[in-house]
């Protein structure tokens, strides 16, 4: 990607909790992207921190299909840890680097509205709507939004249930990228690339190829929601990529040089 061609364009970046360590350079890269004229929008996870605090409080972590069962006490921890601790640590780090940043959650401004998925997973939900008003207001003031995926439980909310809902940050990132009509969606992960059916690392692939990886069962575990989100973003006009956030300055390299992980290209963006 030639940065000069996308100056002032929106790049949605999903930060996995596993890449937010003391040695990680992702936030420094975001500061550099701001200097290059891009408009980063950050969505973060923090599952390991939630699990740590759950253990400290004597709460059992239960997973269904790799996702956290979110009962009442767990929702308290998720909301406090993601929207409070993790979100504000990221914002403080960016401020310390000279980046004007503001931490919000999906609840604020009804940025992300969701509904419960199933009774057995409690307050774990899916995105039903994205309101970009608050995000755009921050971007217009040159403030970088840092978004926790704790969201507004409103759609088909059962009587007497809580107004907060826990939404996986991966699908949230794809929905936000699509709603903003972002130029790029970038997933910072702890794997080098998406793997093909023979275990090979994949570079640039079409959206159709990504869909085939999902339908065939080749993609598994945490790669499934990431690829689904990439497809959502490509349908809205973005390109999407999955890169290894553990490698120093990988984000800047991807957005200036490209070819750093796996890039998913929609049909309208495919090279002739």
From Swiss-Prot:
Q: Which domain of life is it from?
A: Bacteria
Q: What reaction does this catalyse?
A: N-acetyl-L-glutamate + ATP = N-acetyl-L-glutamyl 5-phosphate + ADP
Alphabetized InterPro entries for the sequence = AceGlu_kinase-like_sf (IPR036393), AcgluKinase_fam (IPR004662), ArgB (IPR037528), Asp/Glu/Uridylate_kinase (IPR001048), Glu/AcGlu_kinase (IPR001057)
Example GO biological process term? arginine biosynthetic process via ornithine
Q: Which GO terms describe its cellular component?
A: cytoplasm
Question: E.C. number, please?
Answer: 2.7.2.8
Give compartment(s). Answer: Cytoplasm
- Residues at which substrate binds: 46-47, 68, 166
Q: Does the keyword Transmembrane apply?
A: no
Q: Which residues form a coiled coil?
A: none
A GO term for molecular function: acetylglutamate kinase activity
- Keyword terms of this UniProt record: Amino-acid biosynthesis, Arginine biosynthesis, ATP-binding, Cytoplasm, Kinase, Nucleotide-binding, Transferase
Q: What is its main location?
A: cytoplasm
Site-annotated residues for Transition state stabilizer: 14, 226
Q: Report the pathway entry.
A: Amino-acid biosynthesis; L-arginine biosynthesis; N(2)-acetyl-L-ornithine from L-glutamate: step 2/4
Which Pfam families does the entry link to? AA_kinase
The family this protein is said to belong to: Belongs to the acetylglutamate kinase family. ArgB subfamily.
Q: What does this chain do?
A: Catalyzes the ATP-dependent phosphorylation of N-acetyl-L-glutamate.
Under the heading HAMAP family, the entry gives:
ArgB
| UniProt-recorded name of the protein | Acetylglutamate kinase
Its ancestry begins with: Bacteria, Bacillati, Chloroflexota, Dehalococcoidia, Dehalococcoidales
Its gene? argB
